């Protein structure tokens, strides 16, 4: 009888261990520089995390840490996810200059269309052309924001010469080079530093899409806003939604399937649709805050495009010197954007 009880207890314990092994909860740590209320977190990252948990039956949980809560600075996010300090990140590719030399092509002036079309182009480009520079990561999505605009504290930019003498924040080295070519003094910094820099007079303005402005109260600190007319925006910025490769590979096949079903082209397209949708409400907030708004067109816009063309030419030359076919890369991006616009 005692032996039977011991055997029964052992079998029950064994079944318990098997059940735990198959139903084990895996926690994934997500890290980003943007604050929790920001649209990219509240309407993109959090819903994505909820889908992961729901579709895994609660076995995959995503702990979200925003505004660099786990330490470090925004340019360190890529290393944090590569090294396994965190499991997932969302960041700007250009915050680590030179790390993603092909992906940075998306930062060039007058290339982007809508965020939806350009995000799909960025995802295909990442999967086919920029594979080497992303080989250390599980790519969840590569996407962009809606075309960026020019914002200053009080000087409305209505022509190229209006940028002269202004200290303008650029998010990446490509966009900073564009601002410099257009006559401004470029100041590179991640977006969390923009509000204090405006308040302290370190910068006179910045280029960002409207969507990010409410998260950092930038619409309250700038009163002059300029956009460009036409099918191509002034610029955009490539975003990386990446997972630690070893962490992904350690998951069960079922858990990998959940991740795979919520990443790739469909996620990039969704991101683009969301970012396009974020722009309108944020613009309305800027309008309610008061100020001047202008859209460049005609000869004034042509002058900006002439400078933009030279920035592209210079980027191609630099890419060629680094062993890439710069012209082919730029043309590929243009073709991909057209593909997803049609």
Stretches with model-predicted labels:
Residues 1-8:
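Bacterial N-terminal signal peptides that target proteins for export
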Residues 24-116, 132-342:
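N-terminal secretory/targeting leader peptides
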Residues 17-23:
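Sec/Tat signal peptide C-region and signal peptidase I cleavage site
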Residues 8-17:
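Bacterial N-terminal signal peptides
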Residues 120-128, 132:
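Signature of the catalytic double-stranded beta-helix
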């Amino acid at each position: 009888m005692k032996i039977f009880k011991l055997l029964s207890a052992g079998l029950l314990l064994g079944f318990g261990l098997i059940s735990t092994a198959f139903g084990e909860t895996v926690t994934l740590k997500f890290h980003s520089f943007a604050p929790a209320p920001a649209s990219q977190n509240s309407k993109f990252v959090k819903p994505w995390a909820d889908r992961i948990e729901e579709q895994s039956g609660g076995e995959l949980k995503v702990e979200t840490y925003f505004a660099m809560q786990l330490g470090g600075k925004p340019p360190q996010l890529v290393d944090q996810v590569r090294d396994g300090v965190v499991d997932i990140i969302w960041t700007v590719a250009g915050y680590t200059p030179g790390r993603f030399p092909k992906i940075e092509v998306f930062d060039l002036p007058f290339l982007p269309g809508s965020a939806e079309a350009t995000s799909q182009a960025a995802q295909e480009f990442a999967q086919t052309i920029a594979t080497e520079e992303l080989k250390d990561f599980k790519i969840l999505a590569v996407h962009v924001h809606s075309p960026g605009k020019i914002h200053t504290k009080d000087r409305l930019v209505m022509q190229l010469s209006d940028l002269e003498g202004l200290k303008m924040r650029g998010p990446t080295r490509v966009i900073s080079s564009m601002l410099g070519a257009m006559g401004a003094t470029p100041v590179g910094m991640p977006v969390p530093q923009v509000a204090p820099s405006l308040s302290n007079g370190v910068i006179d303005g910045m280029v960002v899409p409207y969507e990010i402005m409410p998260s950092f109260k930038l619409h309250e600190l700038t009163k002059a806003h300029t956009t460009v007319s036409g099918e191509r925006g002034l610029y955009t910025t490539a975003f990386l939604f990446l997972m630690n490769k070893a962490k992904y590979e350690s998951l069960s096949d079922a858990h990998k399937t959940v991740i795979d079903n919520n990443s790739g082209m469909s996620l990039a397209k969704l991101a683009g649709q969301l970012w396009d949708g974020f722009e309108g409400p944020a613009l309305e907030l800027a309008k309610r805050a008061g100020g001047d708004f202008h859209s460049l067109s005609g000869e004034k816009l042509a002058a900006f495009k002439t400078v933009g063309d030279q920035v592209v030419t210079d980027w191609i030359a630099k890419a060629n010197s680094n062993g890439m076919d710069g012209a082919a890369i730029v043309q590929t991006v243009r073709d991909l954007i057209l593909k997803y616009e049609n």
